[in-house]
Amino acid sequence: PHSTVPGFPWYVIGQTKKQVMESALFQNWFVNWWNAGCPRSCIWSTALKEEIRPVSKLLENKIRTFIIAPVHHVLACEMLFGIFLDQMMLSWPALGHAIGFDKFHLGWNRLISRFEKHEYGSAEDVKQWDSSFKLWLLVFCSEFIITLANFRRDQDKIRARNLLSELFESIIMTPDGEVFMKFTGNNTGWWGTAVFNCLGNILISFVLGVRIYCKLNKERPEDIQIDKFIRWFLDEITFCVMGDDKMSTYSLLIRQTFTLTDMLKVYPDCGFEVESLSTDYCHFRIMPFLGCTTTVYKNYYVPLLDRERMQASLIESNPSLEPPAVLIRINAILREAFFDRDFRQDLLLIREAWISKWNILYEDDKEWLDALRTCDSVGEIENLYLTFERLWPQGSMNRSTVK
């Protein structure tokens, strides 16, 4: 979003990406840098994530950070890879990822229905996914994207490789001014974080598929016929990934031949520490994915969020938050947690009490009136989930050509 910080060194020009991109100084510099082939120029800045963390994580002193990419890197990636990202968003869930996924408008039903073919499988929790990304995996994802982007000009390939090489040896600056170089790990917070994470997770899924296929058919990997393997994979395994989140279901033959422990060995072999979210194969409706399990509402699959997390999200660390912003927050949580009936009733009571408390004082306040317009009824939220809407019809997304 253009309202976010612009990254180093552009703070001296403006506080947001929009302010920086509108400045003549940035525009002139960017044109010269672009014409030169986008040579390496990034110093990434890092900051702590402000979030509510489980007590167990705090006791282990486990904190999370994100990395801020310079605005010129973000803009160049958007210009070069934007169409590729659009195509990925239009392709879910057929390609096994959830980029572009929207739980509303029957999106959750569409996503989960894929797992009816094989009802039992597993969901995994990979620890420190971004920081565990190995160099070979970064290189693979980079070359994969460049190949699929199918650049027509050699100069664009040079630009793409220069931009993506910033991930391999990243110069990082901490809030207190220390500078160091990072040689591995996927930078959290850059333009392609989700894309790289999904591609890495998909690759690991296919590595697992190759192992299973070779053992069942007593073949060596180098002897596999690709077309035959792909047909087998699509018939025997169903999976979906979003970043480090993954859920998979397997055919009865695979579940009878391999234990869940056998399946998870692929992660440490690829450099990741993994923990199964169940002790054995479980039904797809109780597998956590994107922070949700699945329930059925009026014959549709719908998301059921963890109640404890939703209750924690009501806590606001900023005591100066104005009543209109709090009301918007309550409405947003109500939409997310709609299918937890008891919690939904609690939220409706909280919203009613909050409006009663502040409505007279803020009755002429524009922000308060705007916040009141976000107060959807139960029926409106239900329609938001259960009414189909094709948000991005094929061919509807156009981008200006980079010249």
What are these regions (language model features)?
Residues 1-403:
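Viral RNA-dependent RNA polymerase
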